[in-house]
Structure formats: C-alpha cells, structure tokens
C-alpha cells in the first residue's frame, strides 16, 4: 500500500532542493546528514539567480502594482511594503541557511533520530501534514493563478519582479512548513511522553498504597525509576530541539511574524478598498476578486494553524507538569531511587522551563497572540481611517 505521507514529504524534500532552500542532503533510512558538492553548487547557483533577479527588478523600476489596474497612492504604498517585506524575508531566509548550515544539519539529524526511535509518530502527525500541505499548496497555486491572470499587462521588468516575488514566497512558505513539521513532531512526542508519564504516575500511586513492601515492590520501583529517567531524557531532548529551532529559525521567525502582521493589516485594508471602490472601479475582474478572497482566507487560516501548532506544544508541556504534580497525592513515600527520580525530573523542569520565543524577544503564548491580534485590528482600522480622510 502506498504511504501518501512519505510520498508527500519526499515531494517537499525535492521541492526544497529545486528552489535552492536546502544546501545539504540527508538519508532518512540511516539518519545520515551530509554535505555534497552537487547540492551545494546547485543551491548556491539558485540563490545567486534569485539575487540577480531582485537587483534587476529594483533597477528596472517596473510597475509594482500587478493586482489593481487602477489604484491610488496608498494602495501602491501598501503593496510596495508588503512585497518588499516578502522579498527581504526570502533573502534573509536564504542567507540564514548558509550562515547556520551546521546548526540546521544538526537539527535535521535530531529530527530524523526522533522519527526513527518512534515510528508511530508518522500516524500521529499525518493529518497535520495533510492540512499544512493543502493550505501551502493552495496558497502557492492561487498566487501563480493571479500572476498568470496579470500576464497580459506585464512588461519585462514586471515579469522579472513577478518571478522574484513568487520565488521568495515559495521559499518562505517552505521554511515555515519545515518549522511547522518539526513542531508537529515535538507535539506528537509530547503526547507519547505524557501517556508514558501517566502510566508511571498511576503505577506509583498504586504502589504507594501497598503495606507489604517486599522484593517485588523494590523491583517495580526500580523499573518505574528507569522509566522516569528515560522520560526526563526525552523531555530534555525535546526542549533542546525547541532551543535549536529558536536559534536556526529565529530570524526567519521574526520575518515571518512581521510578514504575517503587515500582510494581515494590508489585506484587511485591501478588502475594505474593494468594498469601498468596487471591483469595477479598481478594474478588478470577478475571477480575480474571487481568487483574492480565497487567498486571503487561506492566508489567515495558515497563520492560525502555525500559531496553534506552537501553542499546543505549550499545552502538552503544561499537561506534563500537571501530571508530575499528582505525585503529592501519593499515600506514602516510595523507594528512595524512585523518589529521587521524581525530584530530579521536577528540578530539571524548574531549572529550565519550556519557552517558545521569536529571536528571544517575543514569547509565543496565548496572551501575546491575543495582544498581536488586537494590534492588527487597531492598525487595520487606523489605515482604513487614513484612507477615508485623505483619499
């Protein structure tokens, strides 16, 4: 039977090579991560080509507005800012892959090792992969459709600019998808780890009620202590991977959040403009209007899915801490080794609490996400009011 998850991941893997995002190779069967001359040269040439087209686009002074055939200055400024940020984000992503090539290779090695140790992870993350793949593919397909729809009014400069925007958009989408996949694996591993910890807690609670503490009791406590130490080691590895993600994807994460922020504000304003002026006055066809509406919806959904993925990791970690707190309701003390294992794990978590940050500056929490959404709404309203007053 064909495993569509494996085929999908292989397709994304090849896509990363073709677009120049991956500058090293790996073998999932052996866990080997290595550099190759072929991959390095191809990625370097692809990145140079993107850089040359960007330079040409900025020196050619082509039309930056390929969506609205009739637009005011504010529309053009918003489109320039959104497009410029997307290009900068793509360039920083590419540059970061070269500067942190070694760290990225180590992260991939850890991810493959985690996947090989727990083959059941594949069945746990398949629907998350499918959802993310569908959204990403739909966004890129609609972007290409919009670009093809505008071909009849483009010159050479506009064509090159369009190619640049598509390339950097694909690069950013792939980089965000890679981050999503790693977080998804960490989420699944946390679920497995929580299930194991729950079994240890339940067994320890049962043992705490036993009055007769013979050799079998001691043996069972030693077994549970080993299980608890294994859980603590896995939790430490997961937390290390989260730290590696922040280090490797930190700058990309900052650019992605900035892109999400400004793009949501910009698309909110563009939606208002279409409502205010009407598609006809903006010379926007019905087909383009429908595509834009679907694209905006998918863009919002993509931001929601990415953010929820990280928040769920924090939820699983909170459940992990809650399970450990149940140790206080045990009827009596257990074997000294098991007690020390519990204390060691709690000390490990207290000394190094799990945090997900963007460049170590912006914490990813429900509170910070709500504050960001409120800021997006306020700035969208401000931009709309500015349009109402001056245009």
UniProtKB/Swiss-Prot annotation:
Disulfide bonds: none
Domain of life: Eukaryota
Tissues in which the protein is found: Expressed in neurons of the terminal external chemosensory organ of larvae.
Membrane topology: Multi-pass membrane protein
Subcellular location: Cell membrane
GO MF terms, alphabetically ordered: ligand-gated monoatomic ion channel activity; taste receptor activity
Segments in the Cytoplasmic topological domain: 1-4, 61-74, 149-165, 306-363
GO terms under biological process: monoatomic ion transmembrane transport; sensory perception of taste; signal transduction
Record's keyword annotation contains ATP-binding: no
Extracellular side: 26-39, 96-127, 187-284, 385-391
Family annotation (InterPro entries): 7TM_chemorcpt
Gene Ontology CC: one annotated term: dendrite
UniProt keyword Metal-binding present: no
One family name in Pfam for this protein: 7tm_7
Record's keyword terms, sorted: Cell membrane, Membrane, Receptor, Transducer, Transmembrane, Transmembrane helix
Residue stretches spanning the membrane: 5-25, 40-60, 75-95, 128-148, 166-186, 285-305, 364-384
Similarity annotation: Belongs to the insect chemoreceptor superfamily. Gustatory receptor (GR) family. Gr22e subfamily.
Function: Probable gustatory receptor which mediates acceptance or avoidance behavior, depending on its substrates.
UniProt name for this protein: Putative gustatory receptor 36b
Organism name: Drosophila melanogaster (Fruit fly)
């Amino acid at each position: 039977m064909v495993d569509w998850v494996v085929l999908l991941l292989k397709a994304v893997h090849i896509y990363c090579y073709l677009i120049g995002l991956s500058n090293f190779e790996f073998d999932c069967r052996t866990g080997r991560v290595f550099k190759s001359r072929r991959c390095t040269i191809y990625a370097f040439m692809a990145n140079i080509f993107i850089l040359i087209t960007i330079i040409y686009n900025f020196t050619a002074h082509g039309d930056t507005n390929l969506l609205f055939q009739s637009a005011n200055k504010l529309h053009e400024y918003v489109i320039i800012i959104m497009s410029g940020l997307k290009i900068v984000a793509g360039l920083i992503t590419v540059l970061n892959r070269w500067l942190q090539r070694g760290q990225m290779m180590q992260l991939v090695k850890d991810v493959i090792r985690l996947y090989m140790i727990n083959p059941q992870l594949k069945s746990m993350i398949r629907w998350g992969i499918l959802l993310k793949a569908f959204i990403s593919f739909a966004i890129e397909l609609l972007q290409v459709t919009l670009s093809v729809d505008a071909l009849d009014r483009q010159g050479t400069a506009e064509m090159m600019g369009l190619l640049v925007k598509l390339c950097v958009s694909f690069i950013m989408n792939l980089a965000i998808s890679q981050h999503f996949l790693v977080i998804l694996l960490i989420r699944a591993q946390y679920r497995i780890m929580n299930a194991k910890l729950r079994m240890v807690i339940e067994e320890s609670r049962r043992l705490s009620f036993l009055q007769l503490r013979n050799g079998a009791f001691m043996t069972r406590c030693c077994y549970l202590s080993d299980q608890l130490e294994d859980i603590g080691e896995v939790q430490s590895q997961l937390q290390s991977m989260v730290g590696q993600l922040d280090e490797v994807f930190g700058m990309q994460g900052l650019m992605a959040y900035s892109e999400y922020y400004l793009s949501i504000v910009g698309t909110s304003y563009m939606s208002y403009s279409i409502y205010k002026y009407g598609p006809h006055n903006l010379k926007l066809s019905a087909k383009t209007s429908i595509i834009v509406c679907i694209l905006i919806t998918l863009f919002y959904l993509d931001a929601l899915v990415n953010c929820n993925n990280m928040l769920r990791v924090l939820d699983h970690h909170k459940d992990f801490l809650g399970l450990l707190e149940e140790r206080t309701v045990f009827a009596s003390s257990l074997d000294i080794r098991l007690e020390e294992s519990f204390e060691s794990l709690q000390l490990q978590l207290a000394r190094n609490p799990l945090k997900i940050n963007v460049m170590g500056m912006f914490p990813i929490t429900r509170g910070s996400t709500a504050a960001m959404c409120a800021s997006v709404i306020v700035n969208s309203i401000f931009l709309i009011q500015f349009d109402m007053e001056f245009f």
